Design a protein with these regions (language model features):
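Active-site recognition of the HExxH zinc-binding catalytic motif
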Residues: 69-81
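A common structural junction motif
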Residues: 201-208, 300-308, 391, 430-441
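Bacterial N-terminal signal peptides that target proteins for export
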Residues: 1-13
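Non-catalytic beta-strand/loop surface segments
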Residues: 23-63, 88-190, 212, 224-279, ...
Length: 563
């Protein structure tokens, strides 16, 4: 592919001008660490009297194991249930009811073990079927429900949210992904001490109120957001096929059998391990004085003891994939062809070149909030031009790199045009990849891709909340310095780098392919997740991001589960 020198020069000049215009937006991040190991990131911006607050727990579904999948997301729910003094009318009775519920649940698990064995032997079809319950189990469930009813009469619902609202705060929320759990709120700058007290109280005095009944809430959430969505379980199965060994194998929301059986004791152990201050990062962006803000952090969060054992490492690594993996499914959703290639983590040295490659093939990245998606990218890139405009074989074609803490994927996908089938457009995708492998990219494509990534990077840093989210994403896969370094890493990418990573990672043996066709063989179907959108996962809001903070913003969001 050849392009005029004039177009190339124009693109380079535009890039340089844009970089100069944004030089004033470089972040001045003050990093401090409390004696208990909690990291604090402070960014002073005095354009409005507010502060975007958040604290990040470096824990997500990747830190789980079979038997407790979904626990990271369940804990996100638990952190909104109040503390020993917030959220209840009678703290002593509330704790006693928790103890009684634990005792009954232990007996319920014994009965469930009996049913599990019966199902294994074929004596019953489904241990979760109410018709399979033993009389003893029915009695225990009724006793447990009575305890839940009594506890709910003592609960002051959403008390923490009400306290925040009464003090002018907005946006109290949280989200869970594979690598992090993030708790956020926006406050008036005069209420920073209130925030420090409330959030440190959540960490210092948790009670895990309604733990068991909340499991049912999450099971229903799973049914609504995954199982009942067209193609939801197919995408879940495709993700599990793609990640064979690594904990990315399961969705953030977890397997239903694990959610239904996880215990408060397991939850308490999980909390003590992953919610200790030496595994947390607080992020404050806005109208603040760094020294005064740090003093408040020390006063309130400093009282929480560290976990001397630290966090166990995620040791399971994804093995080298020996051959192409394929899944063909008939589902009630728009047909598509998708190929996910094993790539690298967000902080890997090849991540920047893969980001550029994603923009060349798929178009400009989204500029919305990291981890939450954003405006759909405009149709552009080589795949759109070739498959949609020139060949008219597809109605949409996309590509993106998504790097996470422990691994990454480079994904290409397309929706066939009327009269076309996924199996017909699949080789058209590969043909465009092969062109990059064989011939590389042009200077103009490189310049435009870098400019697009730079625009996305700085656009995300225009607001306090955008800075907060970008810093959190960087901390979840590496450190905030990766965010600061991302523009120069992108700028250092050469045409040779892009061709090299295409040759290295876009190989048949490393890809997992999903072809979906409409049941009955029809070409049109119900809406599905857009190609190039959030990967198979729970809901946007986990699970994606950014492709990691290095380099610059990702072209695709990271699968997250919100609240």
């Amino acid at each position: 592919m050849t392009l005029s020198r004039g177009r190339t020069l124009a693109a380079l000049l535009a890039t340089a001008a844009f970089a100069l215009s944004l030089s004033a937006q470089e972040l001045n991040v003050v990093e401090r660490t409390l004696p208990n190991g909690m990291k604090v990131l402070l960014v002073a911006r005095h354009d409005q009297p507010t502060i975007s607050c958040g604290w990040l727990a470096r824990v997500g579904s990747a830190n789980e194991r079979p038997g407790i999948t979904g626990l990271a997301h369940l804990f996100e729910h638990m952190m909104f249930k109040g503390t020993k003094t917030i959220g209840t009318k009678d703290a002593a009775r509330d704790l006693e009811l928790n103890r009684l519920q634990d005792e009954v649940q232990a007996l319920i698990r014994e009965e469930m073990a009996v049913l599990r064995e019966k199902q294994r032997r074929g004596e019953i079809a489904d241990m979760m079927d109410p018709a399979a319950r033993t009389p003893r189990l029915v009695e225990l469930l009724a006793k447990f429900d009575a305890l839940v009813t009594e506890q709910r009469a003592l609960i002051v619902k959403d008390e923490m949210d009400k306290i925040y609202q009464e003090n002018g705060s907005t946006g109290l929320n949280a989200s869970t992904s594979q690598d992090r759990t993030f708790y956020i709120v926006g406050i008036p700058s005069s209420k920073l001490e209130l925030w420090a007290w409330l959030e440190s109280d959540r960490l210092a005095n948790p009670v895990f109120r309604e733990f068991y009944s909340e499991r049912n809430v999450i099971l229903e959430e799973r049914r609504q957001t995954l199982e009942s969505r067209p193609g939801g379980t197919v995408n879940e199965a495709f993700n599990a096929m793609t990640w064979m060994a690594h904990p990315y194998h399961w969705q953030v929301i977890g397997w239903p059998s694990d959610i239904a059986q996880v215990t408060r004791e397991q939850g308490s152990e999980f909390f003590a391990t992953y919610y200790a201050p030496n595994n947390l990062t607080a992020i404050l962006v806005g109208d603040l004085d760094p020294e005064k803000a740090y003093a408040l952090m020390e006063k309130y969060f400093g009282r929480i003891p560290a976990n001397p054992k630290g966090v166990p490492p995620v040791v399971t690594m994804e093995p080298v994939q020996p051959a192409e993996q394929r899944m063909v499914a008939e589902v009630e959703m728009t047909p598509s062809a998708e190929a996910a290639y094993k790539a690298v983590p967000a902080v890997h040295g090849d991540a920047a070149a893969l980001q550029v490659l994603g923009v060349v093939l798929g178009g400009a990245p989204m500029t919305g909030r990291p981890g939450m998606g954003g405006p759909a990218r405009p149709p552009s890139g080589r795949l759109h031009k070739a498959l949609v405009l020139d060949q008219k074989a597809a109605t949409r074609a996309s590509a993106y790199f998504r790097g996470q803490k422990y691994g990454g994927l480079f994904t290409v996908s397309a929706t066939p045009a009327p009269g076309k089938r996924p199996v017909e457009i699949e080789p058209l995708l590969y043909a465009e990849l092969d062109k990059v492998v064989k011939d590389g990219i042009s200077d103009d494509e490189l310049a435009r891709a870098k400019n697009a990534l730079r625009v996305a990077h700085y656009t995300r840093l225009e607001s306090n909340s955008g800075i907060r989210e970008s810093l959190a994403q960087a901390e979840s896969s590496g450190t905030y310095k990766d965010l600061l370094d991302s523009p120069k890493k992108v700028e250092a990418v050469t045409r040779e780098d892009v061709q090299r990573v295409a040759k290295k990672y876009l190989v048949k043996e490393s890809r997992s392919v999903l072809l979906t066709t409409r049941k009955g063989g029809g070409g049109e179907g119900m809406p599905r997740r857009r190609p190039g959108g959030p990967p198979p996962g729970v809901m946007p809001g986990a699970a994606p991001s950014s492709g990691g903070p290095v380099p610059a913003p990702a072209a695709a969001p990271v699968p997250e589960v919100k609240g």
